[in-house]
């Protein structure tokens, strides 16, 4: 499969709509436009034209826009045909384009291939390319703003600034190593230690902001766990603001997980209602309980719901013992509206009434705190786990470099190597140093047509 052959795809989402777009990218598309329309197209002008089949039948009418390289999304020639958004019509337009461009090597695009070409042609760096997919997938205004900040290059600029400063330090170290006869005290003359301290401080700041970006993009997987009839389904409905889960007084009503995404201050939380945990002979309910424990194992946060009107029993103790130690657990005592006296809760617990709405605002804010979200922080750009991992790797190498800078013998070659590794970690974020396997994994997650 040639990376330079022209490609085509329907660029709009599946289904019916007012407008649908067929996008083509590749070299020398002026010839293809001539074949499709029998006339040349003026670059960057919208032409209202009929879209015809090979036998002259009019398939649709719409706008044809030709973008000449390099002034296009991909950096190649791009031809966009904007017609009506019916699936059958768009498939016919795409088929006609592929037929007309067959001898030119025109083929259907792979998922994410248009954006991959934009990256390879240096129209976008890798972090910006990922932001395209994040903008498409954004499920809240905050996530959309964060994705747009990344797409505009805000995150990449911060990474590039740190990379440039590390390169400058490396250059000075290498010069010192290459010309030992000059007897230059590198660490003193070029103030390497304070420079390194400033670098480390700025990188730590970037890591903290990246954590916020990861939370905004990926959210938190929150599992509601507890015995039957403690109010798990009622709490899910209260947080969602809708009757998502069935609520009855019958124990064991919920037998399989119910997942609902909610947003608190723009942060996505994936709330999972689960089957009540108890000993049972019911085969179907037993399957649901086993699935509950699997959900608990993969949770980012567990809300252990308990009924304040019922005293704890051996089953509560069994549940607590089996909860994974590595996962944060918030004890939530429900149905406080049914008590005659004020409830005296435990430390690190919350008292609520899912049906009465008592304590739900406090619960929402507590969820954000446990997620690590800082509402007072600067509005973040979106980040991915791989970005955060790369930043943390760079920080580790700078920490080791700092240790070498403190040594009396000043082992500059080791100092230089740690700077190189820190720089390599940072450039992996923007794609200046990235394996083909990683590129394939990233762009394969895109939708076709983008």
From Swiss-Prot:
<comment type="subunit">
    <text>Homodimer. Heterotetramer of two MnmE and two MnmG subunits.</text>
</comment>
<comment type="function">
    <text>Exhibits a very high intrinsic GTPase hydrolysis rate. Involved in the addition of a carboxymethylaminomethyl (cmnm) group at the wobble position (U34) of certain tRNAs, forming tRNA-cmnm(5)s(2)U34.</text>
</comment>
<dbReference type="GO" id="GO:0005829">
    <property type="term" value="C:cytosol"/>
</dbReference>
<dbReference type="InterPro" id="IPR018948">
    <property type="entry name" value="GTP-bd_TrmE_N"/>
</dbReference>
<dbReference type="InterPro" id="IPR027368">
    <property type="entry name" value="MnmE_dom2"/>
</dbReference>
<keyword id="KW-0342">GTP-binding</keyword>
<feature type="binding site">
    <location>
        <position position="248"/>
    </location>
    <ligand>
        <name>K(+)</name>
    </ligand>
</feature>
<dbReference type="GO" id="GO:0002098">
    <property type="term" value="P:tRNA wobble uridine modification"/>
</dbReference>
<protein>
    <recommendedName>
        <fullName>tRNA modification GTPase MnmE</fullName>
        <ecNumber>3.6.-.-</ecNumber>
    </recommendedName>
</protein>
<feature type="binding site">
    <location>
        <position position="229"/>
    </location>
    <ligand>
        <name>K(+)</name>
    </ligand>
</feature>
<dbReference type="InterPro" id="IPR027417">
    <property type="entry name" value="P-loop_NTPase"/>
</dbReference>
<dbReference type="InterPro" id="IPR005225">
    <property type="entry name" value="Small_GTP-bd"/>
</dbReference>
<feature type="binding site">
    <location>
        <position position="233"/>
    </location>
    <ligand>
        <name>Mg(2+)</name>
    </ligand>
</feature>
<dbReference type="InterPro" id="IPR031168">
    <property type="entry name" value="G_TrmE"/>
</dbReference>
<dbReference type="InterPro" id="IPR025867">
    <property type="entry name" value="MnmE_helical"/>
</dbReference>
<feature type="binding site">
    <location>
        <position position="250"/>
    </location>
    <ligand>
        <name>K(+)</name>
    </ligand>
</feature>
<dbReference type="InterPro" id="IPR027266">
    <property type="entry name" value="TrmE/GcvT_dom1"/>
</dbReference>
<feature type="binding site">
    <location>
        <position position="253"/>
    </location>
    <ligand>
        <name>K(+)</name>
    </ligand>
</feature>
<feature type="binding site">
    <location>
        <position position="123"/>
    </location>
    <ligand>
        <name>(6S)-5-formyl-5,6,7,8-tetrahydrofolate</name>
    </ligand>
</feature>
<dbReference type="InterPro" id="IPR004520">
    <property type="entry name" value="GTPase_MnmE"/>
</dbReference>
<dbReference type="GO" id="GO:0046872">
    <property type="term" value="F:metal ion binding"/>
</dbReference>
<feature type="domain" description="TrmE-type G">
    <location>
        <begin position="219"/>
        <end position="372"/>
    </location>
</feature>
<keyword id="KW-0630">Potassium</keyword>
<dbReference type="GO" id="GO:0005525">
    <property type="term" value="F:GTP binding"/>
</dbReference>
<keyword id="KW-0460">Magnesium</keyword>
<feature type="binding site">
    <location>
        <begin position="248"/>
        <end position="254"/>
    </location>
    <ligand>
        <name>GTP</name>
    </ligand>
</feature>
<feature type="binding site">
    <location>
        <begin position="273"/>
        <end position="276"/>
    </location>
    <ligand>
        <name>GTP</name>
    </ligand>
</feature>
<feature type="binding site">
    <location>
        <begin position="229"/>
        <end position="234"/>
    </location>
    <ligand>
        <name>GTP</name>
    </ligand>
</feature>
<dbReference type="InterPro" id="IPR006073">
    <property type="entry name" value="GTP-bd"/>
</dbReference>
<dbReference type="Pfam" id="PF10396">
    <property type="entry name" value="TrmE_N"/>
</dbReference>
<feature type="binding site">
    <location>
        <position position="254"/>
    </location>
    <ligand>
        <name>Mg(2+)</name>
    </ligand>
</feature>
<feature type="binding site">
    <location>
        <position position="450"/>
    </location>
    <ligand>
        <name>(6S)-5-formyl-5,6,7,8-tetrahydrofolate</name>
    </ligand>
</feature>
<dbReference type="GO" id="GO:0003924">
    <property type="term" value="F:GTPase activity"/>
</dbReference>
<feature type="binding site">
    <location>
        <position position="80"/>
    </location>
    <ligand>
        <name>(6S)-5-formyl-5,6,7,8-tetrahydrofolate</name>
    </ligand>
</feature>
<keyword id="KW-0547">Nucleotide-binding</keyword>
<keyword id="KW-0479">Metal-binding</keyword>
<keyword id="KW-0819">tRNA processing</keyword>
<dbReference type="Pfam" id="PF12631">
    <property type="entry name" value="MnmE_helical"/>
</dbReference>
<dbReference type="GO" id="GO:0030488">
    <property type="term" value="P:tRNA methylation"/>
</dbReference>
<comment type="similarity">
    <text>Belongs to the TRAFAC class TrmE-Era-EngA-EngB-Septin-like GTPase superfamily. TrmE GTPase family.</text>
</comment>
<dbReference type="Pfam" id="PF01926">
    <property type="entry name" value="MMR_HSR1"/>
</dbReference>
<feature type="binding site">
    <location>
        <position position="23"/>
    </location>
    <ligand>
        <name>(6S)-5-formyl-5,6,7,8-tetrahydrofolate</name>
    </ligand>
</feature>
């Amino acid at each position: 499969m040639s990376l330079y052959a022209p490609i085509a795809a329907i660029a709009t989402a599946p289904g019916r709509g007012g407008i649908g777009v067929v996008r083509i990218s590749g070299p020398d598309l002026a010839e293809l436009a001539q074949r499709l329309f029998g006339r040349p197209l003026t670059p960057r002008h919208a032409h209202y034209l009929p879209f015809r089949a090979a036998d002259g039948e009019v398939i649709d009418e719409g706008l044809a826009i030709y973008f000449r390289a390099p002034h296009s999304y991909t950096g190649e020639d791009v031809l966009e045909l904007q017609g009506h958004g019916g699936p059958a019509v768009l498939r016919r337009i795409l088929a006609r384009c592929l037929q007309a461009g067959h001898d030119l090597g025109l083929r259907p695009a792979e998922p994410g291939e248009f954006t991959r070409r934009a990256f390879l042609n240096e129209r976008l760096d890798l972090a910006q390319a990922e932001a395209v997919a994040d903008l498409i997938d954004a499920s809240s205004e905050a996530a959309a703003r964060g994705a747009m900040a990344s797409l505009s290059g805000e995150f990449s600029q911060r990474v590039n600034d740190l990379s440039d400063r590390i390169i400058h330090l490396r250059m000075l170290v290498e010069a010192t190593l290459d010309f030992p006869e000059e007897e230059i005290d590198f660490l003193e003359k070029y103030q390497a230690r304070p420079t390194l301290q400033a670098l480390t401080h700025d990188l730590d700041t970037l890591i903290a902001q990246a954590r916020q970006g990861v939370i905004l993009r990926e959210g938190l997987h929150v599992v509601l766990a507890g015995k039957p009839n403690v109010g798990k389904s009622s709490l899910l409905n209260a947080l969602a603001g809708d009757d998502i889960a069935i609520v009855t007084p019958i124990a064991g009503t919920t037998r399989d997980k119910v997942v609902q995404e909610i947003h608190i201050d723009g942060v996505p939380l994936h709330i999972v209602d689960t089957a009540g945990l108890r000993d049972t002979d019911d085969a179907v309910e037993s399957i649901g309980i086993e699935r509950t424990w699997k959900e608990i194992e993969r949770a980012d946060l567990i809300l252990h719901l308990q009924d304040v009107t019922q005293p704890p029993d051996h089953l509560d103790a069994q549940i607590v013992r089996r909860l994974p130690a590595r996962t944060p657990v918030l004890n939530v005592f429900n149905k406080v509206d049914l008590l005659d006296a004020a409830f005296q809760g435990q430390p690190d617990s919350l008292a609520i009434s899912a049906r009465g709405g008592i304590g739900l605002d406090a619960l929402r804010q507590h969820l954000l705190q446990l997620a690590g979200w800082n509402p007072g922080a600067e509005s973040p750009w979106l980040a991915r786990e791989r970005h955060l991992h790369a930043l943390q790797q760079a920080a580790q190498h700078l920490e080791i470099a700092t240790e070498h800078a403190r040594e009396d013998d000043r082992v500059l070659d080791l100092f230089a190597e740690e700077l190189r590794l820190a720089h390599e970690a940072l450039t992996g974020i923007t794609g200046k140093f990235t394996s083909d396997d990683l590129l394939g994994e990233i762009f394969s997650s895109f939708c076709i047509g983008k």
